Amino acid sequence: MTNKIGIIGAGISGLTLGCILAKDSKNCTIYEKSDGPSNHGAGISLSPNIIRLLDELEILEKVEKESCLPIDIVWRDNVGKVIREVNVSEFGKLITTNRKILIKHLLDKYISLGGKIEFSHELVEIKNEKELLFQNGNEDSVDFIAGCDGIKSFVRSNYIKNDSPRFTGYTAWRGIGTSDSKRINIYLGPRSHIVCYPINNSLETSFIGVVKNNYKNNESWREEGTHNQLITDLSDYGDFIHSLFKSSEKVFRWGLYDRDKLNNFSKGNITLLGDSAHPM
C-alpha cells in the first residue's frame, strides 16, 4: 500500500502541493476547515516561478484568460511623480489576478487528477505524528503531514512549541476598486507604501497599502475596516489614490505578523509550506 499524505489547508500552497502530488499519482488528501473553497477576493501577482509551475500543471492558459498581463511597473512618490519605470519583459512574464481565480483553477485541476479533499475538517489534534483528529469528530491516519494552514498554523504549533506570530509594527489595507490603468503602480510615501495593479480586463484594480503604526489588529486579511479609517491611515497620498479607495465596495485591514526563522521546514514526517513556514 502506498504512503498516504495529509495536506492541512486548501489555500494556494495546499492546493498547489496537492496538484503536484496527484499528478505524480501519490495518495494524498487535503483537509480544509472551511465548508467550501475560498471565494474571498484579493489581488495577487504571479512571478515567473509560479507561472512556470502553472504551465506544468496545464492551467496557465485558463488563469491568463481571467487575469491581466501588465507590461510595466512604475514607481512613484506619494503625489504621483514618476521615480522609475521598468518594462516587465526585462525579467519575464508577470500575471496579476484575483486570488479566487487561482484557487478555482488549482482546485479544479486537483479534482480532475483524482485528488481527494475534505471540507469542514478543522484539525484539533495530532497524535503520534500520524493520527489526525478533527473538530467534527472525524479521525484519519496518514504517513506524512504537510502543514499548509497559514500563519496561524496548527501544524506548526505542534512542530515548534512557544512559537507565536510576532507583530511587525505595520498594518496593511487591501481592496478592489476600479481604474483604467494597465500598469503596476507602486507609490512610496512617509512610513507607508501602496501597490496598485489591474487584475482583469474589466477595470478592476487591486490595491494594498502598508503603513507603520502600533495598531495590533488581527492578522486575518478578512477583517473589514472603513474607507474613512483607510484614508486617515494613508492621508499622505492625493485624491488620485483616495478615489481608488472609495471605488472599492469593501476594504480590509490586518496586522502584518512574522515568525522566527526556522532552520528546517521538516521534522520527522511533518513538513511546513507557505505562510506556516515563512510568513514574510
Please provide the spans of the model-predicted regions.
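Glycine-rich FAD pyrophosphate-binding loop
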Residues: 22-41
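Conserved Rossmann-like nucleotide-cofactor binding loop
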Residues: 13, 36, 152
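Flavin-dependent oxidoreductases
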Residues: 168-198
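Residue-level marker for buried hydrophobic side chains located in beta-strands
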Residues: 28-30, 145, 266, 270-272
